[in-house]
UniProtKB/Swiss-Prot annotation:
InterPro entries: EF-Ts_dimer_sf, Transl_elong_EFTs/EF1B, Transl_elong_EFTs/EF1B_dimer, Transl_elong_Ts_CS, UBA-like_sf. The gene is tsf. Pfam families: EF_TS (PF00889). GO terms for molecular function: translation elongation factor activity. It comes from the Bacteria. This is Elongation factor Ts. Disulfide bonds: none annotated. HAMAP family: EF_Ts (MF_00050).
Length: 307
């Protein structure tokens, strides 16, 4: 039987984050071989992680990664169970490395991400080890990437400590214009974070959504006693106001000194550099959007853990 020293246990614990007794048992089983002990702990970690996989993960962090040339941006929402874990350096670093992996490897979905090289193995393997180490369920809920068109640029913004993340892309007439609007594009990403647009522009709004808005507007006007011939003239104005609420290009730009839309603000920034630019895409993620958070209290959690 190999002599297992305190230093060996300490080194394995620092490497894996597992408990002291778990590390000692793994080293004994591996007859002192650290790499085998790591493998043993990882296998045990997978078993521990599987038990946590059905637990509610509605907290977390959104992170973005933009390539050095501003031609490609990626975004990911990674969920955990508590806000406490979401704010730890270890979780923040894990999310940052995750979105970087997505960007560098052109990963389109979570299935491909699971198979991607990450750390000492695949992403799926490292995720399960991380779950075992942190002690909470961790889920990569959604990912996305925007690639700039030719003579285009991508920029982004993270708001409220990773609670909201935005990527936004613009097409320009030249690389010079792209460089000139870089900061404006980041400001537009800030606008998107705050104003929560649903669509890029009026052309992106589905026809059935527009028809529904027209029906709602007509019903409201009829209730007000407006005659049919007047209603037909009022509805286009109501649809225009609808666009200004839900389309980023039509929204009133929050950083404008004078009243102007987001599209106008971008165009003005491009013209100042002698060029032209327009928005072509955006992604906005907000942590826990659409998820139901676990409302149980600490006493419930302890009781659940003991059951």
């Amino acid at each position: 039987m190999a002599n297992i020293t305190a230093a060996m246990v300490k080194a394995l614990r620092e490497k894996t984050g597992a408990g002291m007794m778990d590390c000692k048992k793994a080293l004994v089983e591996a007859e002192g071989n650290e790499e085998k002990a790591v493998e043993i702990l990882r296998k045990k970690g997978l078993a521990k992680a599987a038990k946590k996989a059905d637990r509610n993960a509605a907290e977390g962090r959104v992170e973005i990664y933009i390539s050095d040339d501003y031609k490609k941006g990626s975004i990911a929402e990674v969920n955990c169970e508590t806000d406490f874990v979401a704010k730890t350096d270890e979780f923040i670093e894990f999310v940052s490395e995750t979105v970087k992996t997505i960007n560098v490897n052109d990963i389109a979905d979570t299935e491909a991400l699971n198979k991607a090289p990450f750390g000492a193995g695949t992403f799926e393997e490292e995720l399960k080890v991380k779950i075992a180490k942190i002690g909470e369920n961790i889920v990569v809920r959604r990912i996305g990437t925007i690639k700039a068109p030719e003579n285009g640029i991508v920029n982004g913004y993270i708001h409220a400590g990773g609670k909201v993340g935005v990527l936004v892309a613009a097409a320009c007439d030249s690389e010079k214009t792209c460089e000139a609007i870089k900061d404006t594009l980041r400001d537009i990403a800030m606008h998107i974070a705050a104003m929560k647009p649903q669509y890029l522009n009026p052309e992106a709004v589905p026809a059935d959504v527009i028809e529904k808005e027209k029906e709602i507007a007509k019903a409201q006007l009829l209730k007000e006693g407006k005659p049919e011939q007047v209603i037909d003239k009022i509805i286009p104005g109501k649809i225009k106001r609808f666009y200004s609420d839900v389309c980023v290009t039509e929204q009133e730009y929050v950083k404008a000194e004078k009243k102007e839309t987001v599209a106008e603000a971008l165009s003005k920034a491009a013209k100042a550099a002698g060029g032209e630019a327009k928005l072509v895409d955006f992604i906005r993620f907000e942590v826990g959007e659409g998820l139901v958070k676990n409302a149980c209290n600490m006493a419930d959690e302890v009781a659940a853990a003991l059951s």
